[in-house]
Curated annotation (Swiss-Prot):
Membrane topology, as annotated: Peripheral membrane protein
Protein name: Phosphonates import ATP-binding protein PhnC
Superkingdom: Bacteria
Annotated ABC transporter domain residues: 5-249
Length: 254
């Protein structure tokens, strides 16, 4: 597998000495399914948003094989990087009043200028959106309003929207946080299938150890904005799990 992204000594601060991410280094490979594992507040969401250029790091670098250094990119390079980097959000980030199909079509906007995007999108985009909906098992809901879907179905719409971007990387921020166990398995299985069949790198943040072990090729454990472990999922030890959640347990006790 080829290296897709290289992150070196990355730090993100929201004020003096208030680091959400601190001195993080790791790489992502094509077609790799990686889980960012850690409790709430560990810095996982901030890290994901920095990889997509939505949050600016205060130090360090993010190097893309296709777009160079992200933090130093021109507006055009950054726009292309974001098009190649799809996001799947915890709260779906869908427009409830629009149809499922229209929400999925928004994943194609990065391929058009602002003025062109104000017009109806080409039929070829519509066909891509329908194909994505068929793949996530929602073709029969294409004309339904998003607000009428269950939480699990809405998350599948979010994944279909990511698919039509034709990305090289999918970043999924706690995509199963509000779902029941059955729906959680469906969503993670779908992301894993996309990763394996399409050779798209997937980086997903989770706090559930059992799901991380079940689905990840590699687990990057985070606590207090730092990487605690970075290794194959089968090699994650109980002592490392304890280290990931220790500060939360200590806070609960006190």
């Amino acid at each position: 597998m080829k290296e897709l992204l290289s992150i070196q000594q990355l730090s993100v601060s929201f004020g003096e000495n208030n680091f959400a991410v601190q001195d993080i280094s790791f790489s992502l490979q094509d077609g790799e399914f990686v889980v960012l594992l850690g409790s709430s507040g560990a810095g996982k969401s901030t890290l994901l948003r920095s990889l997509n250029g939505l949050v600016q790091p205060c130090s360090g670098s993010i190097q893309s094989r296709h777009h160079g250094e992200i933090s130093a990119s021109t507006n055009r390079q950054l726009r292309t990087h974001r098009r190649d980097t799809a996001m799947v959000f915890q709260q779906h980030q869908l427009i409830d009043r629009l149809s499922v199909l229209d929400n999925v079509l928004m994943g194609r906007l990065g391929y058009h200028s602002f003025l062109r995007s104000l017009l109806p999108l080409p039929e070829s985009d519509r066909q891509k959106a329908l194909s994505a909906l068929e793949r996530v098992g929602l073709i029969d809901k294409a004309l339904s309003r998003v607000k009428d879907l269950s939480g699990g179905q809405q998350q599948r719409v979010g994944i279909a929207r990511a698919l039509v971007q034709e990305p090289r990387l999918i970043l999924a921020d706690e995509p199963i946080a509000s779902l029941d166990p059955e729906s959680s398995v469906q969503i993670l299985s779908l992301l894993k299938d996309i990763c394996q069949r399409d050779r798209i790198a997937v980086l997903v943040s989770l706090h559930q150890v059992e799901f991380a072990r079940q689905f990840a090729d590699r687990i990057i454990g985070m606590a207090a904005g730092c990487i605690i472990c970075n290794q194959h999922s089968t090699k994650l030890e109980e002592s490392e799990i304890h280290a990931l959640y220790r500060h939360k347990l200590e806070a609960a006790v006190t």
